[in-house]
Amino acid sequence: MAISDLLNRRVRAVAQDDEELYSDQSGSDQASDDLRSDESGSESGSDGSLDEDDDDDVSQGDPEDMDDDDDDDDDDDEDDEDDNDDAQDDVQASLSSISFGALAKAQASIGPKSKRSSKASRTEDEPAAPSPLDDIRARIQEAREQKRQALAKNKDSEKLSRSSKHAPAVQSSKHAVSRKRTIIEPPSVPKSRDPRFDPTVLSQGGRGNPQGTSNAYAFLDEYRRDELKQLKEQYAKTKNQEQKEALKRTIRSTQDRLRAMENRKREKEILAEHKKKEKQLIREGKKSNPYFLKKSDLKKQVLLKKYENMNSKDRTKALERKRKKTAAKERKEMPMERRALAGDDAPSGGGRWRLETPQSCIDVGTCCLISAPGSCYCI
């Protein structure tokens, strides 16, 4: 009964996940069993040596004593055999009382270990056979390595070139991305700025109120006039022709700039007066809708006001300049045979036509073609 209790207590089914753990434990148990067997062998060896000593002593003794000892040994052997028979009977009785479940558990626990041990011994004895999958993997790895090396060589050897000199340059769109990322933008360094173009100034009085801006920077007009006066004095003192030509161009550009600014100022004044009159007429009820000036009407009023503010000498010079400008413009638009030239110079044609510009036609700003003496055809 002791053996059945021992088997029922220690034997249990082994799960597949714990096979390695139990295999390690079984290995440790086998090692401990080997150690125990060695110790028992050493003890039996020592017992054997003692028995040999006793036999030697007995052999040295009397033969009668030896006979008595032999009889005693025979009796002891018979007793031992009887004891062994009783023990075997007890073991068989206990095994017959063991349940089939306990035997199945014991067989399940012993079976896989023996298979694993046999497989391990076979693998240790027999060399590992080459697998076809390993060969395929090795070939694929070699092919990839060769392809990588070929691509590296091509990149080094080939240079970006154009098919012709007229073709656009070839540039790769692949660029390495920097590992650094701007998480927080640093504060911008303040730059020097012109207050005339400052958005804060323009928002307050620039675009919304141009009149306020012009009034705020009215002192610049005085600076420009002083600068023009200094340029004229320097032009009078300079004797070098190159410097005189440069000063002359600068003076002309400055005068044109001042003249354009005066014209714009005059236009603003005329528009302001016209708006004021129209508002007054609407307020009085004489008009229901305001009249907006056209560009041509505005230009005429600006020119009229400009000539009114001039003295007689300046007005004459301005009219003469305007007349020459208009005549030259109309002359360019005419054919070569009808262009008016000074004196008796005729255009290329041998003098068949005589071109003149009578004073009466010049006053109205037109040119005439004189085909015969005494006849004038105004265009």
Swiss-Prot record:
Residues 133-162, 224-284 form a coiled coil. It comes from the Eukaryota. Associates with 90S and pre-40S pre-ribosomal particles. Pfam families: RRP36 (PF06102). Its main location: nucleus. Keywords: Coiled coil, Nucleus, Ribonucleoprotein, Ribosome biogenesis, rRNA processing. GO terms for cellular component: 90S preribosome; nucleolus. This is rRNA biogenesis protein rrp36. Component of the 90S pre-ribosome involved in the maturation of rRNAs. Required for early cleavages of the pre-RNAs in the 40S ribosomal subunit maturation pathway. Residues 14-219, 313-350 are annotated as: Disordered. GO terms for biological process: maturation of SSU-rRNA from tricistronic rRNA transcript (SSU-rRNA, 5.8S rRNA, LSU-rRNA). Residues 134-161, 327-342 have a biased composition (Basic and acidic residues). It is found in: Nucleus, Nucleolus. Belongs to the RRP36 family.
